[in-house]
Design a protein with these regions (language model features):
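Conserved catalytic or regulatory cores that recognize and/or transform ribose-phosphate-containing ligands
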Residues: 1-184
Length: 184
């Protein structure tokens, strides 16, 4: 099986598409499907690209380590749609919510909650989806978002044993040699 502990993010970048195709070909109808909720927006284009790389890493981790078919529109849609254009951003959000409706689990990844993530968490709560959080730092905020939706936080769980999914993009996609492999 694929060894997730990669020596650098470039290798992961080169394998993520193949791994996702493998994932789609070999998963059965019984394989859980999850929507990866993580930040996309950033102050710079480089930051957006790092967040896109991070979500692809989260998807690979979910497949390899959790046995979950993970989906995330922000892994690829920014190549086609401009997040700074309100019309295109809304289209991307609508595509994401349509994908979310087809999943049974919401994986809340990273160590912060963005505006787009708040909408995804609200929608998952309204739909009764299982919500898994990987960073204790954002757990209370996720629970508050669920409660704002008029629901209890019973569907929200913390899974700290998979701490890789709590790492921010700048740790997963390091600009120097120290990165995610140092914490795995």
């Amino acid at each position: 099986m694929f060894d997730f502990k990669l020596t650098n993010h470039k290798m992961l970048e080169s394998y993520w598409a193949q791994l996702m195709i493998y994932n789609l070909m070999l998963t059965s109808d019984k394989t859980p499907t999850a929507y990866v909720c993580s930040p996309l927006r950033a102050d710079t284009q480089h930051g957006v690209e790092m967040n896109m790389s991070a979500v692809r890493a989260y998807m690979c981790y979910a497949f390899v380590k959790l046995g979950i078919n993970a989906q995330a529109p922000h892994a690829f849609l920014p190549y086609f749609l401009d997040d700074r254009n309100p019309t295109e951003r809304q289209l991307a959000l609508d595509v994401g919510l349509a994908m979310l409706r087809k999943c049974s689990i919401l994986l809340v990844c990273g160590n912060r909650i963005s505006m787009g993530m708040k909408g995804e968490i609200r929608e998952a709560a309204k739909l009764g989806k299982e919500i898994r959080v990987y960073s204790r730092d954002i757990l209370d905020e996720v629970i508050a978002i669920v409660k704002e939706s008029g629901l209890t936080h019973g569907s929200v769980t913390i899974e700290e044993e998979h701490s890789y999914l709590a790492l921010p993009a700048e740790v997963i996609i390091p600009t120097d040699r120290k990165g995610a492999d140092d914490v795995m």
